[in-house]
Amino acid sequence: LISSLEAVRTGAVSVRLHPLVILKDSLLAQEFVRGLFSPPGLEESLEILWKMYLIINGAGVDVNRIGVCLYGNEIKNVVAGPYHPALGELVRNRLMLEVLREHHRLGGSDHIALDKSHKGDFTGHRRYVIVTASNEGIIVQFRENGLRLDVESYLNSIRERLLGGIYAQT
């Protein structure tokens, strides 16, 4: 997370978030094969990336890519690491899951009937957000004239809880 705070502190206008992906024929690939090095997996990387995105985006810095972009046969060169073709979407999905968790933590109901306008944000890639929330006891439905969450307010609350007074100074 330190690099996120540094990007904000130094006045970056835009950033790219690239977790370590090991490619064939690299020095890291050799170390990986020998068991000397292992990159974080997808879940561990998502746990870091959503927080980085929250910090950077919340400071008004544009995040213009998340994850390495590989095309066609280049994907076959991935040896290890958190490569996913929709990594940016997964990070934003995780952030929306955190919004639901924050809503619940702050006294929201176990059953949330969100306005249909939230459906795209709170469904997620392969229904990740609503399925994970449901597994945690937070049931999400969508309907006309449903609850309209102030997402930015929840993101600010998460930022403050995550970083305390540090974030307020960036």
For the regions a language model picked out, list residue spans one by one.
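Catalytic cores of alpha/beta
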Residues: 1-9
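Non-cysteine beta-strand/loop elements that form the S-adenosyl-L-methionine
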Residues: 12-25
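Auxiliary Fe-S-binding modules of radical SAM enzymes
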Residues: 27, 34-170
